């Protein structure tokens, strides 16, 4: 691609589209510092160093509490009450209270375990102060407000409905009714137990998801996004409808390492959509092609969306098993997108981009070989050595930062600017640490709120009652049950992010599908059911 277009790609990718773009001065420095500390905490937690040095080891629940605490604090430091307003002093106070509610679990974890779910009440003279009831209730309310700011109202409404169902269960329709949880039991289960807010979903976020998001952030800041786009244009840019196919291919390659539809769209769409419009695609079709290809990045191995990691923990299989089963559907989906874009180009009579305006394939491929090394490291550790996803992504992330450092040192020999290159590497690394944490705010908050729903289902016996309800509606008709699941996914998907949508529907419907399928003479593998819900 010629120099001006090449520069345009880099400018679009470098454009600050993050939630922190309105922050300035001391406020920005504080947010950046907290984000970097969060990233270092996650790197330490995922590394083998705590076991090697017998220092800094964190148990499951305290680690999850710290993880959510960082997410809540950053959410209130970055996202104001109303989108167009600014963060004020009250927002900062709420953020500090939120992380304090989480850190209470870290500092008093042993006491919580010893009391076996009984909430502590402080005796002060003739007064009894339910300290932990206040802390837990405050934490839940702050989590819901953070979700409203970061994700939106729909997920909050659903979570509140499940909380009300937990408390007022005796007033629900008879077929799903239950005795109702006391406020102490409700708060204790939701905030201080490992089956709800701090359950499996956020545990997966702590163990795997953060580092995969961090890996994608490092790769993007090092120039990986531009490399994959250039490579996509070099491969298919000259074909009929080339920009659309390049958008699909670029989004697919970016999706292999980002696992985020939003990050994918931002990285590739800011450049590919204008190019598609210039070559003849309508703005609606250009946007649709980019969104479809970017969203499909969540199902593209080796780094799928956050829901895939939650799925592995729900089912009790390795992440590699999920990747293995998801690979073929992902390839088929991108082949279908290629075919559709080709038909659109034929219908519109479009041609490809002129060859002299495209990057040369060999030069482009060789220029970014160092970006492929960490990806191969990740695949090798996951697939061949069968290391845990946590260790695999940790070593892949370290290899990415190290390879980028070596690349900067080697290239400095050509331009004799070692100091400048090392400064660039340092800046890319720091920005990667910041972006990784900031990109995780929405994921962490959404997963924690989805945990409210999981906790409500588990504590009220709703899943068992729901099987009876669904069976009475479907009457052992698997097709009707599948259609009900599809409709539920679509309705929730209009307002929920992918991971939250998956957690909610999987909690409600996955075992129902398996049980009704068995009763009807069909054997549905549990992994197939969960992938169906995910897709």
Segment roles from a protein language model:
Residues 2-28, 35-36, 324-439:
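Long, contiguous bundles of hydrophobic transmembrane helices that form the permeation core
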Residues 229-297, 307, 316, 499-535:
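Hydrophobic transmembrane alpha-helices that form the pore/transport pathway of multi-pass ion
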């Amino acid at each position: 691609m010629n120099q001006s277009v090449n520069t345009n790609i880099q400018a679009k990718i470098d454009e600050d589209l993050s939630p922190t773009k309105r922050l300035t001065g001391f406020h920005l420095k504080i947010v950046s510092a907290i984000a970097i500390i969060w990233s270092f905490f996650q790197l330490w937690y995922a590394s083998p160093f705590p076991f090697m040095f017998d220092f800094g080891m964190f148990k499951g629940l305290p680690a999850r509490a710290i993880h959510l605490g960082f997410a809540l604090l950053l959410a209130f430091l970055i996202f104001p009450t109303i989108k167009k307003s600014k963060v004020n002093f009250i927002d900062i106070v709420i953020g500090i209270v939120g992380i304090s509610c989480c850190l209470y679990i870290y500092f008093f974890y042993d006491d919580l375990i010893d009391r076996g779910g009984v909430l502590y009440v402080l005796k002060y003279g003739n007064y009894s102060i339910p300290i932990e009831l206040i802390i837990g209730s405050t934490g839940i309310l702050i989590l819901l407000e953070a979700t409203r700011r970061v994700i939106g109202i729909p997920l909050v409404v659903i979570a509140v409905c499940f909380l009300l169902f937990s408390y007022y269960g005796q007033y629900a329709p008879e077929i799903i009714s239950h005795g109702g949880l006391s406020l102490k039991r409700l708060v204790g289960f939701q905030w201080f137990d490992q089956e709800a807010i701090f359950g499996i979903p956020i545990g997966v976020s702590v163990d795997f998801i953060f580092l995969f998001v961090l890996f994608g952030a490092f790769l993007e800041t090092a120039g990986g996004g531009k490399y994959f786009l250039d490579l996509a244009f070099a491969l298919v840019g000259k074909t009929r409808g080339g920009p659309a196919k390049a958008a699909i291919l670029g989004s697919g390659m970016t999706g292999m390492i980002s696992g985020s539809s939003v990050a994918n769209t931002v990285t590739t769409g800011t450049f590919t959509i204008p190019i598609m419009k210039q070559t003849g695609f309508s703005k609606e079709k250009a946007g649709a092609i980019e969104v479809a290809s970017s969203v499909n990045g969540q199902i593209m191995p080796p780094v799928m969306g956050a829901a895939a990691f939650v799925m592995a923990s729900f089912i009790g299989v390795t992440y590699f098993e999920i990747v293995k089963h998801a690979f073929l559907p992902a390839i088929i989906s991108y082949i279908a997108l290629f075919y559709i874009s080709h038909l659109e180009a034929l219908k519109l009579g479009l041609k490809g981009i002129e060859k002299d305006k495209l990057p040369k394939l060999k030069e482009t491929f060789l220029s970014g070989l160092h970006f492929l090394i960490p990806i191969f490291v990740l695949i090798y550790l996951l697939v061949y050595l069968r290391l845990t996803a946590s260790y695999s992504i940790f070593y892949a992330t370290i290899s990415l930062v190290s390879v980028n450092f070596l690349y900067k040192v080697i290239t400095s020999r050509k331009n004799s600017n070692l100091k400048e290159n090392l400064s660039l590497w340092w800046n890319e690394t720091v920005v990667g640490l910041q972006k990784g944490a900031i990109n995780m705010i929405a994921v962490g908050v959404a997963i924690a709120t989805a945990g409210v729903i999981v906790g409500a289902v588990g504590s009220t016996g709703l899943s068992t009652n729901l099987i009876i309800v669904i069976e009475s509606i479907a009457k052992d008709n698997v097709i009707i049950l599948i259609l009900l699941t599809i409709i539920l996914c679509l309705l929730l998907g209009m307002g929920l992010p992918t991971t939250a949508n998956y957690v909610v529907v999987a909690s409600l419907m996955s075992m129902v599908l398996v049980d009704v399928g068995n009763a009807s003479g069909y054997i549905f593998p549990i992994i197939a059911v969960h992938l169906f819900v995910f897709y």
